[in-house]
């Protein structure tokens, strides 16, 4: 489980991006923050937390205390309905991360993600009910091939650029999100990880693929896009629905606008009724390339 990295980014950003802008910055009541995902062939994973006050000092203790426990979460694929069970794992930083997933004691009701399937989630927590829907679309847009080239205008000869050739099927409305994994690292999403097909509808095209970033660490803005000779690179390309696209498009815009006094306030577009966050389905394809030293 590597979702603790995404969880930290999500709960911090949702806590700040939803703050109302006014002159009297009072403390706000915590809201439920939901990060729920399901991928083809994988079990659902749901992380529940409480949002922070705008002026909170983020610490390991604050993060550890933000998880929401003992929620009743049910997930339906239209045929089966399963109730998820709460688990935890301990990160290398000794932080316990709590999440909900398949109940291993009731596998008869359990299911994993599948293409072309709609999912309905119901959350009951602290006397309130929250609902959301998502879908795993067909694996419509695919990566045909990967290769690498020397990083242009870079004096470091060990730096390379990943290049992908992809095909977009005819018809608007194909949305994607991508991640990269380098060697033993986890998958990280791109700085701008979501795209639509408004310009490239129905075409086969090539493009440079930026390296994914860990938003919980300082990012070298001049070099983060590059990979290195000797790297084993895995590209994860996922087809997503419109609501998942809208969430990450607005979330990433908000992330990149933090600290910019000239940017317009942006409301992150979630799809959880009554709460912050999102429930997203992913139709995933994986391709790996080894860059020689």
Predicted features, each with a name:
Residues 18-293:
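A sequence/structural signal for flexible, mid-protein segments enriched
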Residues 13-16:
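C-terminal motif of bacterial Sec signal peptides marking the signal peptidase cleavage site
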Residues 1-4, 18-19:
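Positively charged n-region of N-terminal signal peptides that target proteins for export
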Residues 5-9:
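Sec-dependent signal peptide hydrophobic core
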């Amino acid at each position: 489980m590597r979702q603790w990295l995404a969880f930290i980014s999500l709960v911090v950003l949702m806590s700040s991006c939803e703050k109302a802008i006014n002159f009297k910055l009072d403390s706000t009541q915590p809201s439920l923050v939901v990060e729920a995902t399901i991928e083809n062939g994988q079990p659902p994973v749901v992380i529940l937390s409480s949002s922070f006050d705008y002026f909170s000092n983020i610490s390991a203790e604050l993060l550890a205390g933000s998880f929401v426990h003992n929620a009743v979460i049910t997930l339906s694929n239209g045929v089966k309905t399963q109730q998820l069970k709460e688990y935890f794992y301990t990160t290398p930083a000794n932080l316990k991360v709590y999440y909900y997933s398949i109940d291993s004691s009731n596998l008869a009701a359990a299911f994993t993600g599948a293409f072309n399937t709609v999912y309905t989630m119901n959350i009951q927590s602290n006397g309130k009910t929250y609902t959301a829907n998502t879908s795993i679309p067909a694996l419509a847009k695919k990566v045909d091939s990967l290769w690498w080239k020397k990083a242009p205008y870079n004096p470091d000869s060990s730096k390379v650029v990943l290049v992908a050739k992809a095909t977009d099927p005819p018809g608007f409305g194909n949305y994607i999100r991508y991640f990269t994994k380098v060697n033993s690292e986890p998958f990280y999403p791109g700085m701008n990880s979501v795209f639509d097909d408004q310009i490239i509808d129905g075409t086969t095209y090539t493009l440079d693929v930026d390296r994914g970033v860990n938003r919980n660490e300082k990012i070298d803005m001049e070099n983060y896009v590059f990979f290195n000779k000797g790297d084993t690179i895995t590209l994860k390309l996922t087809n997503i629905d419109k609501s998942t696209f809208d969430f990450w498009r607005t979330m990433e815009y908000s992330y990149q606008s933090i600290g910019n006094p000239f940017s317009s306030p942006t409301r992150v577009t979630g799809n959880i009724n009554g709460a912050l966050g999102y429930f997203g389905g992913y139709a995933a394809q994986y391709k790996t390339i080894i860059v020689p030293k």
